[in-house]
Amino acid sequence: MGRAVGIDLGTTNSVVSVLEGGEPVVIANAEGSRTTPSVVAFAKNGEVLVGQSAKNQAVTNVDRTIRSVKRHIGTDWSVAIDDKNYTSQEISARTLMKLKRDAEAYLGEDVTDAVITVPAYFEDSQRQATKEAGQIAGLNVLRIVNEPTAAALAYGLEKGEQEQTILVFDLGGGTFDVSLLEIGDGVVEVRATSGDNELGGDDWDQRIVDWLVEKFQSSNGIDLTKDKMALQRLREAAEKAKIELSSSQSANINLPYITVDADKNPLFLDETLSRAEFQRITQDLLARTKTPFNQVVKDAGVSVSEIDHVVLVGGSTRMPAVTELVKELTGGREPNKGVNPDEVVAVGAALQAGVLRGEVKDVLLLDVTPLSLGIETKGGVMTKLIERNTTIPTKRSETFTTAEDNQPSVQIQVFQGEREIATANKLLGSFELGGIAPAPRGVPQIEVTFDIDANGIVHVTAKDKGTGKENTITIQDGSGLSQDEIDRMIKDAEAHADEDKKRREEQEVRNNAESLVYQTRKFVEENSEKVSEDLKAKVEEAAKGVEEALKGEDLEAIKAAVEKLNTESQEMGKAIYEADAAAGATQADAGAEGAADDNVVDAEVVEDDAADNGEDKK
């Protein structure tokens, strides 16, 4: 059996770690660095370059160099190189293959298994695609683990057995996550998680690029975004300036021969960016981290004062403005400085690989699903089977029925989100369960089961209990959630809570009214000979009144019509009861000749008959 490693597959950089003698070790790559740029390039001679070598030649090979592919994982994105289309999984696999090779060179043996980390807010298709990238790279992916959870695992195990509440603030190159966890006695339990899949260090870099482009255009009248090589040089300069501003008050950006003017004279770019100006042009990006932070604290049901430790993860957390914001949000608590933000996630992944391979004992990792999952039921209602922040793996079942008589099939539509109305949430996928035996509505029993595995991947099964037929879907259709959609779901759920509640109540009134009409008519049909024509006419008139009210939007009119039908139904029930009682008394007189013993028996029979008709004799 080969070795197992932990891999942090990052947007900007990736890291691989392994357990040596039970202790995690970060493996340096062939170039001697402990982090490997997540950059892949296709040289014109056919060679595929990965890591620093790919990054070094990016300026002269712009169209054939791919970076930050993690932002496209799980989508239909692809890039054409030499008439061949490469998916995000294939590009990511190239980075994983280099990490695998470098680990094998260090260990002197094969690496076969890996735990790969993903942002906590990655949805199903992104997790599936990450797993596929690992498989393409020749790795058996033991587990997909959330990055903040892996970081907490690495941090928490060093702190001994004492119970503690840890906040992980993870701002990487392309994604942002914040998680609140409880750690103690070998158990790492995620209480809540939130994030933004479209916020990371790349966005800070882009703001510097935009600033430089604007400065150059105002000075020279030339738009550098039209020049691919110039733009690549700007990106690299922006990243260096951002890093420099973490330790200096200003950064000089000097790019000679950036382009030429109309007369072919070379032009230079020379600007100085102060830390204050950098923070000004990126303040809205920083502000976007506040909402997920507040959401996590709210969902976990803890106060900021109860947080024991704050762990910063991701190279972008080195920016002073980020550190200061985290300190402000946590009531002045200093973030932990003893953790390497670039390496801690890979270390946690290696520990989890050790747990799964039995090399690390007495450690239990309990992660959560970030958004609620459910199906659409009658009236467009979102019926949640699994609530957000539920510990995974988990499995939940609920039994539903048909809405129409002799309904041959049901359409199962799977949604993810927090709104009460299904269509306001994200449709993940749908499938049909057919072959339902003909039966009145309400009779078939359809059991719907949601199963989320330890990788956070969703499987949904629908089974007809009567026939045993079932159908299953694994949500992997690439219908990913953008962060805008996730933010909208959370905000809409709060802003429209009253509206959603009202719509749900209205639908329940309508559903109950329809059901009452159906059940009443069925009852009349079954007891037709016991009810007078006059009473049957009154009941039918009341039933039609409900149907007429249901055509409109007046909820009070529906309730009034239902009340009238209930009154007439009670009169009908009373008449049926009296008819049954009279029939029983006649039978008793004819067969018992007044014997007291027989009268007791007959009374019991009458009570049974009454009970069968839904009435209590007592």
UniProtKB/Swiss-Prot annotation:
Q: Name one Pfam family in it.
A: HSP70
Recorded superkingdom: Bacteria
The protein's induction, as recorded, is: By stress conditions e.g. heat shock.
According to the UniProt record, list the residues that bear Phosphothreonine.
Answer: T175
Provide this UniProt record's keywords sorted from A to Z.
ATP-binding, Chaperone, Nucleotide-binding, Phosphoprotein, Stress response
Give the disulfide map.
none
What molecular functions are annotated in GO for this chain?
A: ATP binding; ATP-dependent protein folding chaperone; unfolded protein binding
What NCBIfam families has UniProt attached to this entry? PRK00290.1, prok_dnaK
* Family, similarity comment: Belongs to the heat shock protein 70 family.
Provide the function of this protein: Acts as a chaperone.
Protein name according to UniProt: Chaperone protein DnaK
Species this chain originates from: Corynebacterium glutamicum (strain ATCC 13032 / DSM 20300 / JCM 1318 / BCRC 11384 / CCUG 27702 / LMG 3730 / NBRC 12168 / NCIMB 10025 / NRRL B-2784 / 534)
Q: What is the lineage of its organism?
A: Bacteria, Bacillati, Actinomycetota, Actinomycetes, Mycobacteriales
Q: Which gene encodes it?
A: dnaK
